[in-house]
Amino acid sequence: MRCRAGVRLASAAFALATVMCAPATAQDLARCSAPLEALSLEHAPSHFRERIAQGKPLKIVAIGSSSTSGAGASSRAATYPARLEAELKAQLPGLPVTVLNKGIGGEEAPQMVARFEADVFEEAPDLVLWQVGSNSVLRDHPTPGEIIRQGVERLKDSGAEVILINPQYAPKILAKPGVEQSVDVITATARDAEVGLFDRFAAMRYWSETEKIPFDHFITADGLHMNDWGYACVAKLVANAILDGTQLPPATATATVGAIKR
């Protein structure tokens, strides 16, 4: 399935299936796409979508490790949280949108949970995107399902909705025996806790196996971190997954129609 410019609120500017970003190379020829199962979220952030329909300000905290902080990106503006904020603002013209980047490289789930009070709860977000699992896989540690489950419950108790993001599909991750266990644990945790799951692993595997996009189009030379194209595509897919089927508030809908007419 192509990157869903056909969601109800996509503007003409996002009708292209290709995400264009610096540097302008052969990467620009690769299409940003993903299978339906990677984008369905399973448990959508319904209250977040209600805020959109009501025209209320939106705040998201993206917490995670180096692929949240943006290792491999050419600038802070090219990280996935920054690109996500830009995507949401473009698709929701007139709505105040803030995406806070709370990624710290090298962390595993326990270290992230320990930061929740300062980095998540004090921000009072409407939605939390929790990218987790990659460093456990890299260090041959079992992905701690119980710690993640407890963390999700704390996030929910704070009033935020939650979307989990599993490991990236990258050579250094694929070389480790624990990757499937990590993907399975995070999937099961999201399902059991009734929170969203953005299946980054499946989306990136689709790029490689179905779209036949070489790793160097979306992964840096370290074999682990995404480049600007990879982060931009993930941001677009996450935005479309969050917004799919969302009813726009009248002011935003009018602005979007105006953008299409132009």
Feature locations, PLM:
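Active-site metal-binding loops of divalent metal-dependent hydrolases
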Residues: 65-66, 104, 134
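Short gly/ser-rich anion-binding loops that grip negatively charged ligand groups
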Residues: 70-74, 102, 106, 110
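Short glycine-enriched, charge-decorated loop/helix-capping segments at active-site entrances
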Residues: 74-75, 220
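Alpha-helical cap/lid subdomain in secreted, periplasmic
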Residues: 82-98, 107-261
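N-terminal secretory targeting modules
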Residues: 1-63, 68-74, 89-95, 122-123, ...
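Hydrophobic residues in alpha-helical segments
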Residues: 52-53, 103, 208
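Extracytoplasmic small-molecule ligand-binding "clamshell" domains
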Residues: 69, 79, 97-100
